[in-house]
Structure formats: structure tokens, C-alpha cells
Amino acid sequence: MTITTSKQLPSLAQLPETYLIELSEFGAISLSGEEQSKYLQGQVTCDVNSITESNLLVGAHCDAKGKVFSVFRLINRSSAHLLLQPTASIEGSLKELKKFGVFAKVTIDIAEELGFIALIGKQASSLIQQEFSQVPDSLTPVVQIGSTSLVYLSGEQPRYIIIDDKATITAITEKLALPTYSQSVWNLLEITQGFPILTANTSGHYVPQMLNLQAINGISFTKGCYLGQETVARMQYLGKNKRALFCLNSQLEQPFQSDDVIEKQLGENWRKAGDILAHYQADDGSCVIQAILANDGDLPILRIASQADSVVTNQTLPYTLIAE
């Protein structure tokens, strides 16, 4: 039996009470070996030394200039570190990690054997309890039950990522028998929660603070040296960063195009306002957009360049930006 994934693209308000998301474009880089923690500590923004079997870290992997290859959620599974992230950002990050990994006792690879599904909504915790007898939460966000890893993500709608081999994930999905949506709906939730989504096209362009990593505990300023650390510290303590990640809303008459541009009004003219990282357009035309814009004052009047009559508004994120 195969998983039947709905092709519908509901708005946030139209999602059912409890549902699944097939994370078909989600994956993980695995690091294992005697020096896995020591090596990773020198490569990423979070404090790898603080990871345990039951906690979760957010972090970024940067180049020497502090530009971000990937943003990930770090967990431990079967004595290995897993960097959970969209598959679109894995290749570039993996290449760079392997480049320096040859000098350490560490094995670095894509966790190809794993499958991922997300359980979300009002009854999600009850279903997790029923199926696994233990529920991760804000205090213990990672739980290991046999071969299954359960990861809790807080938010207006708590999310649970279920990780196991692909056959087991399929079996769990069939047993739960809930409405199941595509990865696009996951992107909707990530955008509204202010969690940055990077692809091959946007990897290597932004420092962590432009992606709001400092606001979601994705940067340790006390851990010591890592690749790109000087740039990240300079941005934080010298107030060099003037851009931030925003969640924008619009109601569009036409489909949003991958090459669309956000414009700002300057008098009678319009100019590019910033960069679009990701978007989600529901079947009813409502659209949420993840964009990097100037953060040095009130947002100007915005529009989608290809749809001149569009109105773009700012949606408040569930966190505040730490003062630079």
C-alpha cells in the first residue's frame, strides 16, 4: 500500500484539526565516529557540546566568510548526529563538511535509509501517546522509542517529526489514516513560524543574522571558534547587519512565479525590496512569502512585481529580534 497525499493546498485556516505531512523533500546529514562532536563543533553556529539524546539544537553551517550553506535542526540518533534539513540544502553543505572531515575521525554522509513524516494538530500528542507511549515536549523535545525518533517542534500548532526507516514510516502513516499533505504545507508552517528555508539557489548568500538565527537560539556566542565565527560576531556586536527575515502575506489573482520579485514604493516609482527565499500559495490565492528585507525602519508599501495591483503586508513572527 502506498501513501495517498492530497494535492490540495489549503490556507492555514483551512487545515484540518489533525493531519500528516509527507516530508518527501526533507532529509538529514549524518555524522558519526570518534570525533563527530569535536569536528562538528568547529563547523556550525550552535554549541554541539550541549547536545544530548533528548534535546534539540537549531544551527547553521557557514563558509569562512560567515555565509550560510544550510540551516538545520540537530538531534542525536543511534550515537550519530543528524542535521535535519530540506534536501535542497543538503548537497552544498555535505560537500563542505566532507572537505574538512578528511582530517578528523568522522564519517559524514546523507542518511538515505531514513524516512520522515510530520504529525500536526489538536490530537497529535494523544495519537503519539497512543502509538508510542511517550510524547516529546518542550522540556524533552527528542524521544527515542525503539528504532523510532520523535521530535517535538513548538508553535501555535505543535509539530511532531517521526523518523524511522522508510517502510516503518509508511506503516505508521497507513495506521494513523489521517489527511496527508505534501511538503508544500510544511513550508507554509516553516514560513509562518519564521524558520528559514534555504535552497541550492539561496545557499551561501546570507549571514545567520539575516535569517534571524540569533532570535531562534541558532547561534552560540560563547562556544568559541567555528567556520565563519568572526563575521557572525562582528554582525552581532558592531551592528553591521541591516537585514532580517520576514513573513509576508498577499492575496493574489495569478499564480506566484518562482522568479517573482518583491518591490517597494519610492515616490511614484518601484524598486526591488529584497530577496524571496520561499513561498506558499493556497488554492484560494492567499500567499505567504518568506523574504529578506531591510530591517532599518518601518516597512514601505510592498507589492509583487508581476502583479501590479497586489498588496503585500507583514505578518508578525512568533519571536522578537534581539537588538543588534
Curated annotation (Swiss-Prot):
Pfam families in alphabetical order: GCV_T, YgfZ_barrel
Residue positions annotated to bind folate are 186
- Could you give a GO molecular-function term held by this entry? folic acid binding
Q: List the coiled-coil residues.
A: none
Give the Gene3D superfamilies listed for this entry. 2.40.30.160, 3.30.70.1630, Aminomethyltransferase beta-barrel domains
Q: Where does it localize?
A: Cytoplasm
List UniProt keywords, sorted A-Z: Cytoplasm, Folate-binding, tRNA processing
The record's annotation in InterPro entries points to: GCV_T_N (IPR006222), GcvT/YgfZ_C (IPR029043), tRNA-modifying_YgfZ (IPR023758), YgfZ/GcvT (IPR045179), YgfZ/GcvT_CS (IPR017703), YgfZ_barrel (IPR048451)
Give a yes or no for keyword Chloroplast in this entry.
no
Q: Tell me, what is an example of a GO biological process annotation in this record?
A: RNA modification
Recorded GO CC terms = cytoplasm
Record bears the keyword Repressor: no
Q: What is its main location?
A: cytoplasm
Q: What does the UniProt function comment say about this protein? A: Folate-binding protein involved in regulating the level of ATP-DnaA and in the modification of some tRNAs. It is probably a key factor in regulatory networks that act via tRNA modification, such as initiation of chromosomal replication.
Write down the HAMAP family for this protein, in alphabetical order.
tRNA_modifying_YgfZ (MF_01175)
Q: Say which family it is in.
A: Belongs to the tRNA-modifying YgfZ family.
Descriptive protein name = tRNA-modifying protein YgfZ
Which source organism? Colwellia psychrerythraea (strain 34H / ATCC BAA-681) (Vibrio psychroerythus)
